[in-house]
Amino acid sequence: MAHDQLHRYLFENYAVRGELVTVNETYQRILTNHDYPAAVQTLLGEMLVATSLLTATLKFSGDITVQLQGDGPLKLAVINGNHLQQMRGVARLQGDIAPGSSLKEMVGNGYLVITITPTDGERYQGVVGLEGETVAECLESYFQQSEQLPTRLFIRTGQHEGNPVAAGMLLQVLPAQDAERNDFDHLAQLTATVKAEELFTLPANEVLYRLYHQEEVTVYEPQDVEFQCHCSRDRCANALMTLSDQEINEMIEQDGEIDMHCDYCGTHYLFNSLDIRAIRHDSSGNLLH
């Protein structure tokens, strides 16, 4: 099975572009060190595929966060990705989730938040109600409301050789182009026939040929997708310095050290009294980076 990659492609005879992504290794890394219920694992896979596809639509350096939150047993699920296709994600539960639970059963009364943060420029946030039955349907509504670009997402998750796998495709009318709705619907119907097993096991070019062998398609150089966490000891130290001396001293007196745990990658950062003394000395100048 090939490593995780995103492939962009363009239909020469239609004002429509597409993306195909596989995120198997990244998906498995996100699930490592977490004992999520099966339905939550599936949901995170869908969100990971969707975030990768959305991030690839960015025309600038920056990142996208796709977040689900509500009052159901799934309190929060979030995937963060950037223009380099570096992904991470986590979920937080506040109740039991049965196998096969639907999106609405997990989230309850909630919403989907898409946050776009350019490296240079203003942050943008869009909020979408959970009107669709799936993450893909909710995001299609987001595109229709925010960008008014006909967009379809085709997301597949499952198991292959005992491991969780996820992949998907995106079709979108090119901005400032007048694509015939019938043309877009025709391509969407072709894309909807893609089988999960094809996405999980076949090279991207073969999948695209099977779907569009009667169309003229240009496929661009692929981009690697990988799990990447941005936590660090210095970031944890900076966070500690936002606490009062009394709070820090009480934590050290109680446990002998402070254990800061990254929910995304599972790394533990330990700080004892000597570490705190050194951090306080450093923080008297500039914050750590």
UniProtKB/Swiss-Prot annotation:
Paired cysteines (S-S): 229-231, 262-265
GO terms of molecular function: protein folding chaperone; unfolded protein binding
Gene3D superfamilies for the chain: helix hairpin bin (1.10.287.480), Hsp33 domain (3.55.30.10), HSP33 redox switch-like (3.90.1280.10)
Places the protein is found: Cytoplasm
Keyword DNA-binding: no
GO terms under cellular component: cytoplasm
Keyword set, alphabetical order: Chaperone, Cytoplasm, Disulfide bond, Redox-active center, Zinc
Biological process according to GO: protein refolding
Changes after translation: Under oxidizing conditions two disulfide bonds are formed involving the reactive cysteines. Under reducing conditions zinc is bound to the reactive cysteines and the protein is inactive.
Main location: cytoplasm
InterPro entries associated with the record: Heat_shock_Hsp33 (IPR000397), Heat_shock_Hsp33_C (IPR016154), Heat_shock_Hsp33_N (IPR016153), Hsp33_helix_hairpin_bin_dom_sf (IPR023212)
Keyword Chaperone: yes
PANTHER family in the record: 33 KDA CHAPERONIN (PTHR30111:SF1)
Family under the similarity heading: Belongs to the HSP33 family.
Function noted in UniProt: Redox regulated molecular chaperone. Protects both thermally unfolding and oxidatively damaged proteins from irreversible aggregation. Plays an important role in the bacterial defense system toward oxidative stress.
Protein name: 33 kDa chaperonin
Source taxonomy: Bacteria, Pseudomonadati, Pseudomonadota, Gammaproteobacteria, Enterobacterales
